[in-house]
A protein has these predicted regions:
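Generic beta-strand/beta-sheet core signal
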Residues: 193, 205, 240, 253, ...
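Short, solvent-exposed loop/turn and secondary-structure capping segments
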Residues: 107-109, 154-155, 249, 340, ...
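Conserved beta-propeller blade repeats
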Residues: 35-54, 80-99, 110, 127-148, ...
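Beta-propeller blade-edge and WD-like acidic-aromatic loop motif
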Residues: 9-27, 56-75, 94-95, 99-122, ...
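N-terminal pre-domain segments of enzymes
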Residues: 2-38, 633-655
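Flexible loop/turn segments at secondary-structure boundaries
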Residues: 199-200, 222, 245-248, 271, ...
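Active-site-proximal cap/loop segments of hydrolase catalytic domains
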Residues: 426, 433-655
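Cap/lid segment of the alpha/beta-hydrolase catalytic domain
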Residues: 350, 355-478, 483-486, 520-528
Length: 655
């Protein structure tokens, strides 16, 4: 990764409002952490078994070709925007098809790239959103989801990437939640997955006529599929299936009564990912929970499993086989190690690391998070991961920053902290990452416990976290900060007005401030999902409830310093959500730091923007969290008596 020299002046595309000049000690002190780059395996070149690698370029993430392990990579794309996904065409190789948006607006366009000449061609219309690209097994066609038709939902297209004019619609869904999973090997059908709250339906779509067939339409086959792949003879499907209590198994679904019987790994109840080799003989799959995942390779013909792969349990992602069926590529990382590209050879049974980043010079190279469990207000068990600074270097009770993930349908799993290791190494600040109710990974019931009128129960879970912090003799409950992005940004604001007397300050990144204005103004392709998750503001009773719990309507109750970060091109949480909160806070003379990225979306992705935002946020916490005494912008008595407002009247009706 190329790290640009940090300057005291912000990058030209950042609009700064109320953020003081950042000391050089912070700008330069945080810089080494940005030199630690994660290199992600994306796929294989089908003829040479070279790897496609996603690495940070000068400002944005770009595609590189790596011909041999630990070798010199060749920059393949030099695009002004981040590359969101790329792959060689199966069997054929060239061209590479990749996706990129504009300033983080998530209106991804598809491009083809000749890796020899560097010539790039736009494959889509330049205005729509296109994603979910899946390649057929011959390398002649791709299937993808797109809004090009102008309808409310994404439709499914197929196209020959060598001929953009060949693109055509094969299915127009009447709802959202559709994914393209695989192509039949004869090219005649596409395997599509329709995800709802209650089931994952598998459909077969004829690529010529568009005729659809529901594959899981009987009691025997009515299963919640999460992922699926055709067998090479197209007579069956392997899939990940979600069962009761969060159990995930690997199952085989025959499509013909007289089809061959394929074997699946026995006694697997915690599968997380799977991928078939092109010949269908080998299945790679990942099992485990949280940070203790294990990679396996299984023979679907003999039912035999390869010997244990010599890698410590950690995190695995993006399993992909070479066309010759001999090597499995994947990404491997942990809390102590950034993701890097690896391969496993099924013939030699050898693991090879292809990319490397040296972290030995950083003090937190061996940091190990602690899994903390606690009871919430209703005795529900919640959990989170705590990173502590070195007690020898930082004795006594340490300040804490609680960092809340977005979603809420997501889960925090201990990954490499990146620049946030600076908090542990230099500031001596502990970091706590909770998984409150509504998080995934703990079963369907847990994920539903913040639905509808129970939305603020997840905020009460943060109250339980604050209670637990007060019981730990090594943590300072009088110096707690809070931060979060997207839904975690909303949670940050909600915590500030419910528990303002128990936290010092908060940093909201791309968080929404009013449920109703968010649901009205978010992009149309995101609206159905947002309404399903957060509530439908068009229903009068729900509208009233959402207005009652929106942070914007409680701005007068926020008395702690607040930093807000927004992206002008954000399609999910419009920057207007942040603007209206800043205006409300300014009206009451609160301390508010505001940063708007004019070339950013739902997160800061340009290198210099991300570095400057992180340095500013670090300075914010250094200013308002570290001092022994609270820095108070408003009357101290108003802070110490702020009550929790969980008495907000809720409408009556079914839960």
């Amino acid at each position: 990764m190329t790290v640009q020299p940090l300057r005291s002046a912000p990058p030209s595309d950042l609009v700064i409002d109320g953020v003081p000049a950042i000391p050089d000690t912070i700008l330069q002190g945080t810089a080494p952490y940005w030199k630690i780059d994660e290199n992600f395996f994306m796929g294989w070149e089908p003829k040479t078994n070279a790897m496609l690698i996603d690495s940070m370029g000068k400002e944005t993430r770009q595609v590189h070709i790596l011909k041999s392990p630990e070798g010199e990579s060749t920059l393949t794309t030099a695009f002004p925007e981040n590359i969101a996904g790329a792959s060689f065409m199966p069997q054929i190789g060239s061209p590479i098809v990749f996706a990129a948006d504009h300033y983080g607006d998530e209106f991804y366009q598809l491009y083809s790239l000749d890796p020899i000449t560097g010539q790039t061609q736009l494959l889509t219309d330049g205005d729509s959103r296109n994603d979910g690209t899946v390649y057929d097994h011959t390398g002649k066609q791709i299937a993808f989801l797109s809004t090009m038709s102008g309808g409310r939902y994404e439709v499914i297209y197929v196209m020959n990437p060598r001929d953009p004019d060949s693109r055509r619609v094969i299915m127009t869904p009447e709802n959202d939640g559709w994914l393209v999973e695989d192509w039949a090997h004869d090219g005649g059908h596409i395997l599509a997955l329709h995800l709802t709250w209650y089931a994952g339906y598998l459909w077969s779509i004829n690529t010529t006529s568009g005729e659809t067939r529901l594959l899981t339409n009987t009691p025997e086959t009515q299963k919640y599929f999460l992922e699926a792949r055709y067998t090479p003879d197209d007579k069956g499907i392997f899939g990940l299936v979600l069962g009761v209590h969060g159990v995930i198994t690997i199952e085989y679904l025959p499509l013909e009564n007289n089809g061959p019987i394929r074997k699946v790994p026995p006694n697997v109840f915690d599968a997380l990912d799977m991928e078939l080799s092109p010949d269908g003989v080998w299945m790679a799959y990942v099992t485990g929970k949280k940070e203790t995942q294990t990679l396996h390779v299984f023979n679907t013909i003999t039912g035999e499993e390869q010997p244990k792969i010599p890698l410590a349990p950690a995190l695995f992602a993006r399993l992909r086989w070479t066309e010759d069926n001999t090597q499995l590529g994947f990404n491997y990382g942990s809390a102590a190690m950034p993701f890097q590209a690896y391969s496993y050879n099924v013939q030699t049974r050898q693991v090879t690391q292809w990319t490397h980043t040296d972290i030995s010079s950083l003090p937190t190279a061996q940091v190990k998070p602690e899994l903390i469990k606690m009871r919430s207000f209703d005795e529900l068990e919640i959990s989170g991961y705590l990173y502590r600074p070195d007690p020898q270097k930082f004795p006594g009770k340490r300040p804490v920053v609680i960092s809340i993930h977005g979603g809420p349908s997501a889960e925090y799993v201990p990954e490499y902290l990146g620049a946030y290791n600076y908090y542990l190494d230099t500031l001596g600040v502990a970091l706590f990452y909770p998984n409150v109710r509504g998080s995934t990974g703990f079963g369907a019931r847990f994920a539903s416990l913040d639905d509808g009128l129970k939305r603020e129960d997840s905020v009460k879970d943060i109250g339980a976290v604050l209670d637990w912090i007060a019981t730990d003799p090594r943590l300072d409950s009088s110096r707690v900060g809070i931060q979060g992005g997207s839904y975690g940004g909303y949670m940050t604001l909600a915590t500030l007005f419910h528990y303002g007397n128990r936290v010092r300050c908060g940093s909201d990144m791309m968080g929404f401030t009013d449920f109703v204005t968010l649901l009205r103004n978010t992009k149309k392709w995101w609206q159905p999902s947002a309404r399903r998750e957060l509530g439908d503001e068009r229903v009068p009773e729900m509208n009233k409830f959402l207005e009652g719990i929106s942070p914007l309507n409680h701005a007068a109750d926020i008395h702690d310093p607040l930093m807000i970060t927004a992206g002008k091109s954000d399609p999910r949480v419009p920057a207007s959500e942040s603007d209206q909160m800043v205006k409300a806070m300014r009206a009451q003379n609160g301390i508010i730091w505001y940063m708007l990225g004019e070339e950013e979306g739902h997160g800061f992705h340009r290198a210099t923007d991300a570095q400057y935002q992180f340095a500013a946020e670090t300075y914010f916490f250094e200013t308002y969290l570290l001092p022994e005494k609270r820095v108070t912008p408003l009357a101290p008595e108003s802070i110490t008596t702020v009550p929790a407002k969980f008495g907000t009247p809720a409408p009556t009706g079914p839960d």
